[in-house]
Amino acid sequence: MGYNKSLRYSRHDGTSCVIDNHHLKSLGAVLNDVRRKKDRIREAEYEPIIDIADQYMVTEDPFRGPGKNVRITLFKEIRRVHPDTMKLVCNWSGKEFLRETWTRFISEEFPITTDQEIMDLWFELQLRPMHPNRCYKFTMQYALGAHPDYVAHDVIRQQDPYYVGPNNIERINLSKKGFAFPLTCLQSVYNDNFERFFDDVLWPYFYRPLVYVGTTSAEIEEIMIEVSLLFKIKEFAPDVPLFTGPAY
């Protein structure tokens, strides 16, 4: 808007205007009043619902529920992922799973020494780019209810994947509804026969995940994959036996 000469003169010729500061309010105070009024309206809407909801107990996140989390890192591996494709993380057959370029097993022994009951089991995947200054996102697809005899393909095309969660870490809950895990000394089974540990101990009670990972990059990328299992153990079973005898 340009300069208008008529704006220099008052419309009220020959009169004076007196402004009373008691009737002025800052814009911030007005906005705060509006916000407080909205909060009071929202609280009035939720009051009858909150009274009913207070009678129920829910967990905010199953991973943070009751129990103790025990992590066992299976392996770290570097994979080369091509554009518009996704690679299978592990096929759960044999000790090496899927060995491609480099594999290092972290946990040689199971970290739980006594009879334990597993309340929940998570498959945790951590992804990291191997080259600096790479601007792409990690994508992922997975299936839980696959038939035990199904042979998964090592590479698939990306079709409607979703992005991996914050910090490039994704957790998948493997619990089956209505399946209770028996008390088992997991360390002895894990150390005696690692190859059969999954088929004999875990998969009858938990889902066997088939997980594929990829990137949004248009080039071949090298990514670091770290695979872990997170066991949620009941707290009543101690890590160290408190007594000695035939029952322990």
Swiss-Prot record:
Pfam families in the cross-refs: Polyhedrin
Domain of life of the source: Viruses
Keywords, in A-Z order: Viral occlusion body
This protein's GO CC annotations: viral occlusion body
Family statement: Belongs to the polyhedrin family.
Name of the protein this chain belongs to: Granulin
Function text: Component of the virus occlusion bodies, which are large proteinaceous structures, that protect the virus from the outside environment for extended periods until they are ingested by insect larvae.
GO MF annotation terms: structural molecule activity
